[in-house]
Regions:
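Generic recognition of well-ordered alpha-helical segments
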Residues: 35, 347-354, 423, 445-453
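Active-site-proximal alpha/beta segments of enzymes that process anionic O-linked groups
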Residues: 9, 22-199, 207-214, 446, ...
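Secreted, luminal/periplasmic, and some membrane-associated catalytic domains
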Residues: 3-8, 17, 24, 31, ...
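A long, amphipathic alpha-helix that forms part
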Residues: 5-6, 176-202, 212, 218-263, ...
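Structural motif
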Residues: 14, 201-205, 262, 425
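Low-complexity, glycine/alanine/valine/leucine- and proline-rich hydrophobic stretches
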Residues: 388-447
């Protein structure tokens, strides 16, 4: 059964929660989250598999377009600009060249309100209103369409907090206050715009949950290697989920009962056990060669003297690992013959997959080739995408540690990494409730489901089917 609306139902609202974790939302905290639980019990729900890589950028743009990272040519926050060794660019909204849901709906006369969706700075024209995302530099930037909306919001709410800046900080009290205030403001603005505008499609994404997970996971998880018992922050994540539950309830009161409601996340969250120093490992294995002088302190690879004539591969840090081959005829000083590239990637993948933790115990690292993930890989994809410990370990790109395993993050305190599955709740009047979770739902099914909800033809670029339930 396709999850289609009644003919009398005209509107759909998506509430996005960056990094919402199903084991917390559906299990551990569920009995204390009446709004989430009601929507779940009266609708369909389940885990939502993310794209690879399961990263905020590009996952939200993938969800809103129904196209994978290869089609977008976006493989993370920073992507190679060209085949030089050091030019990386941030993938903001200008990097997204495919139509997203509000673009498609605008073409069919539908009005959208788009708030805080990652990948929307700078904002673009649409039929409706848009406020850009956490990539907005500050409140002095042009962050709305139409521009007059910014004047209105500035008068009503003052400077808008797009993100909790510097969330990798030991100043936990300040950060918690910042995230809480930001989230309340986000929902206050969402209610204001939802109530004062006619719309067909509404989407708002809250980034605060991701920041809370990264900053406070160790205090609630007694399996975390840095768990602190009896911490004053033990209930911070729980209380934040309760805050979201209450704020969503207030937003739903404004939206009303005549709309379909979808709650989604771009990925889940899990404890982070540490980091794998990818470039240190490549040096130790003979794939990456540095020329003197050597760094005695952790340093970005781009700032070091790499002997590219003796280097076969290098990597980038982040929540997942990205490895690039130094291919002859592609990179300026390439050393790997193109015909040998596949065998070399197989060799490196096998070694990385067998790499254990600091005690040699298996961690289940997974390596992916872009040609096996995506029908088309636009832009410059990594030659290898690496999930260290299935994302329980992050990738460390800096060099100078003289070790492979780090038990802390190299860019500041960080307790959590992403997980491959986020959450999905879909609820609208007339929908038959499902007590069991919807199996096999994928992030790339969201866009075609929304297009289908409005009775429009699904674009051929959306390869995944509409969500369905038995």
């Amino acid at each position: 059964m396709r999850l289609r609306r009644k003919s009398t139902l005209k509107r759909l609202a998506i509430i996005g929660l960056d990094c919402a974790e199903p084991s917390l939302l559906f299990e551990r905290f569920a009995s204390d989250l009446p709004t989430f639980t009601r929507l779940r019990e009266q609708g369909v729900w389940g885990k939502l598999e993310s794209v690879i890589p399961a990263i905020t950028v590009p996952a939200w743009s993938c969800m809103m377009s129904g196209q994978d990272p290869g089609a977008l040519g976006i493989y993370g926050f920073r992507n190679r600009f060209d085949y030089s060794y050091d030019r990386l660019i941030t993938a903001d909204g200008d990097a997204v060249t495919v139509p997203r849901l509000w673009d498609i709906l605008s073409q069919h006369g539908k009005t959208s309100i788009v708030l805080n969706v990652p990948g929307t700075y700078p904002p673009r024209p649409l039929r409706g209103k848009m406020m850009s995302c956490f990539l907005t530099p500050d409140a002095n930037a042009a962050y709305t369409y139409p521009p007059s909306l910014q004047v209105d919001l500035q008068a009503q709410f003052g400077d808008y907090p797009f993100d909790a800046r510097d969330f990798r900080t030991p100043a936990k009290d300040r950060l918690l206050q910042q995230i809480t205030t930001m989230t309340r403001t986000h929902f206050e603005v969402a209610r204001y715009l939802a109530a004062r505008n006619d719309w067909d499609f509404f989407v708002s994404v809250e980034i605060g949950l991701d920041r809370i997970h990264h900053a406070f996971w160790r205090y609630m998880d007694n399996t975390h290697r840095h768990y602190e018992s009896n911490s004053p922050y033990a209930d911070v994540i729980f209380e934040y989920y309760r805050l979201l539950d209450a704020e969503i309830a207030s937003l739903l009161n404004v939206i009303g009962d005549d709309s379909a409601i979808m709650i989604v996340s771009d990925h889940g969250g899990q404890k982070m056990d540490g980091g794998i120093c990818l470039n240190e490992w490549l040096i130790a294995e003979g794939y990456l060669t540095l020329a003197p002088p050597y760094s005695e302190t952790p340093t970005k690879l781009q700032a070091l003297n790499v002997d590219w004539t003796a280097t076969k591969a290098w990597g980038e840090g982040g929540y997942y690992g990205r490895l690039f081959l130094n291919i002859s005829g592609r990179e300026p000083q390439g050393t790997v013959v193109p015909e040998h590239a596949s065998a070399l990637l197989n060799e490196i993948s096998a070694k990385l997959s067998s790499l254990g933790n600091e005690n040699g115990q298996p961690i289940q690292t997974r390596c992916f080739r872009p040609e096996t993930l995506y029908p088309v890989a636009n832009g410059i994809p990594p030659d290898l995408l690496i999930y260290f410990g299935n994302l329980a370990w992050r990738s460390i790109g800096t060099v100078g540690w003289n070790q492979i395993h780090l038990l802390e993050n190299d860019t500041g305190p960080d307790d959590a990494n992403h997980a491959q599955h986020g959450v999905l709740i879909f609820n609208f009047p007339g929908l038959q409730p499902h007590s069991e979770p919807l199996p096999g739902a994928h992030l790339l099914q969201i866009a075609p489901t929304v297009v289908d909800f409005f009775g429009l033809d699904i674009p051929e670029t959306m390869r995944y089917p509409v969500l369905s339930a038995k």
